[in-house]
Amino acid sequence: MRKLSNYPLPVTVILMLLLTQIIVGCGAKQYRRVEQTGYLEDYSEFVAGKGNEALYVYVNPQADCRKYTKVMIDKVVLMGKAKDSPLAAMELKDQKMLATLGWGTIYDAMRKGQFEIVSEPGADVIRVKAVITEADKAIVILADAMMVAPYVWEAATVWGIGTGKWPFLGELAGEIEISDSQTGERLFAAVDKVVGTIGSNMDPRAKWDDVRQGFERWRDLHGKRMASCRATGSFVMPADERSWMQKSFDYLSP
């Protein structure tokens, strides 16, 4: 059996992070990059997100969230970037599952912000539309094999650090827009992508767990945003409360 000291330094660091991750557990994490699909049409005012923000984000500086108390949530749609994308080849039952999870994620986030869910536009109503642009289940047996046999993924270490995702793990990407339900004015929009982490899913039957955990991450972050905007009026995400150590762990962990 190889000693930890016999591995190259980058691999040693990842092995140590992996051992920590196995002990404390970890869910989905943010990917390093994401492609814009055109669903939101105008991306000219988007900026790169920082901290716990989405990868790309737009916040209307003139918007006052406190004037809104209700929300309309459109049906979440799926839009693959190419005909050969996992979304295009996905079974109908899985497509319905993703759309349901997406809508439920938005619903839970809005309820955390104490918004009333309605079906008609109004002066105090915001409208939310969202699209799932990527969703791919994990190949769980291969992903978990990398935990018990580090040599399986040693060759992928440098690639994994560079992209933020190891092979065989699940992934989820999407776009969201919040607008005034009457005028259509854009108040907030974001494009983001999250991926699974090694050790977050130990059940070989639960191939969609990485995606489910991605939705949970979005639910928690958007819920935090909506609760804050009801108090401050701004759609800006509250300050990232993670320690520098946790941020480094999230960035480097497989």
Regions found by a protein language model. Name each.
Residues R2-V13:
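Bacterial N-terminal signal peptides that target proteins for export
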Residues G27-V59, T163-P254:
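C-terminal/domain-edge helix-coil "capping" segments
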Residues V59, P86-L98, Q114-I117, G162-T163, ...:
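Second-shell loop/turn segments in exported
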Residues G80-S85, I139-I141, G196-S200:
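Short acidic/His/Gly/Ser-rich catalytic and metal-binding motifs that mark active-site loops
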Residues G113-Q182, M202, S253-P254:
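Surface-exposed short loop/turn segments
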Residues I22-G25:
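C-terminal motif of bacterial Sec signal peptides marking the signal peptidase cleavage site
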Residues L17-L18:
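Sec-dependent N-terminal signal peptides
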Residues D64-V131:
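N-terminal segment of the mature soluble domain
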